[in-house]
């Protein structure tokens, strides 16, 4: 009788252990999802970008919202979504921010002085410009750094900010209805 009771106790312990494993993963999944929603609601753009781009988990949702991400195989290979493309007026290409980053980078091509110009911006969490770089091909076919007027840079920054804000709103709507 005591052996059967001992066996029964071991079965209960084993059952509880096996139940704990999927419970842990389910809890983690929903905790991550709620963390993303909190980041959206607190307007923490860098945290939102990090969580959206950190794996292939949100790639189908990003595609559903109408944005461009690499194929799932490339995301699995790279470990992140790189780049996230917002096909607006500027066709932004956003690099995935690192965890706990204070800034993020984006790239786009535009026309400055009627020449194709490659632009790189580094923005902070409030989408303020930290640094920028502008380059054009010279007559020899080499890229050279150029400077742009303050008004041109302000115009480009405002366009970038509005496209990122529109992306954030659309992604929130797509994910949380």
Q: Language-model segments: what does each one mean?
A:
Residues 82-177:
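Extracytoplasmic electrostatic interaction patches
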Residues 1-7:
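Short, Lys/Arg-rich N-terminal segment immediately upstream of the first membrane anchor
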Residues 7-12, 47, 102, 114:
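Intrinsically disordered, low-complexity segments enriched in glycine/proline and serine/threonine
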Residues 10-25:
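Hydrophobic membrane-insertion alpha-helices, especially the h-region
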Residues 22-100:
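N-terminal export/targeting and maturation segments
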Residues 8, 34, 43, 55-57, ...:
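Short, flexible coil/linker elements and helix-boundary hinge sites characteristic
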